[in-house]
Structures are given as structure tokens and as C-alpha cells.
Amino acid sequence: MTLEELENSLPNGFHDAEIQRICIDYQQRIMTIDMAVFVGDVDAPLEKREAYREGTLVISGLQFATIEPPDARYPFSTPGASRIDACDMTKNLDPSLLQALPEGSFVRSFFVDDWNAFLHIAGLRAEIQWKTAVTYRNDREHCLPGETVDL
């Protein structure tokens, strides 16, 4: 499965997922990303809306992983998880690098909100290994258009 296919199998893709840890094993060509995936439904009742599930994203057959430096104007050094969203940024990558990838490779990028920068990944297979059941947070971060929010 490609990273985009995995993303499409999730209720919200990787939108508002939170990266907690990244590990790369170059000998085994495996990248693991511990994350909390937003699996909530914005149309759900408030107490069920902020639903997250923790898991480990496993990229096997890792071809490359590139982390862009953060924008200095963003809170990149604040401890804690980093919120992401997945996207296609192949237009920003070297075409000769993309052509050199083995057949069957995928390339996908994560935009890291706290950095205003990207994490680019190329690999052969992607899967998520769930570590927890769905948990519900009390913080309101996902609102419907026109919804009144008490501050």
C-alpha cells in the first residue's frame, strides 16, 4: 500500500495528525513515525468530535526521508507533538531524484504546521500499526462553519 492509499483509508487522512517521534533504521530501510491520528467527525456531538487514535506509521523499503528546516518565525522549538497534513509536493523535488526511484516507489509529503516546512518521504510500502483505541479529547479544535465557540 502506498502512503496516499493509506491516507485515503483513514476518516480524515493525515489531516491534523500529530507526530510524536520519528525513527529511521537505515540498515533495514524502515522509517517509523509515532503519531496520534485525528479520526473524529466534525458532525459528531462535541464530546465525540475530538477523536484521536495513536499508532505507528511504518514506511518500509525507505528510499529517502528529507526534513526541511523550520521557518524561524514559527514556534519550532516548543516541546510537544507537531501537527501535520499530507500532500503531494513532488513538484518541489528534483525530477532526476524522482526518476531514479525504483519502480513501485511512492513519494508523499507532510506539511508540519509548527515549522511551516515539509517532511518528504519515498518508500515502497506504508502501513499503520494501531497502539491504542480511540480516545476523546476535551479541547475543541475542530469546529463547524458558523459554530459559536465560547472562549
Name what the model sees in each region.
Residues 1-151:
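Surface-exposed, interaction-prone regions used to assemble/regulate multi-protein complexes
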